[in-house]
Amino acid sequence: MLALLLVPSVSVLAHADVSGNWRVEFTVPSGEMAVNMTINQKGDALSGRVVNEDGEFPLKGTVSGDDVTVVWTVPERGAPLEITMNGKIEGEYINGIARLGNVGEGSLTARRMSRNP
């Protein structure tokens, strides 16, 4: 009697490690901007904070493979402005697009300054 062993095929998508302290630079329609970002990662979920001259703001996001999405909200003339960063991680860099609510979008480059311990 011939027995067949069936092993289910499981595709495992490894998530890039994006935890650490980042310097993010944007080129958007209103000019150039820069923020410092601390990202904590648990599986595919991201949390942390964004710091710029206007203050400190909580962030949330996800990572899938080498695709990263980070979102935070800042007060802009009394109304909240949601900023979304979509990019691909390449080693110690993230390159992609920043979307500033309905104001516009532009390119971004982020560089990891240090990793979380």
Please place each PLM-identified region on the residue numbering:
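Bacterial N-terminal signal peptides
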Residues: 1-9
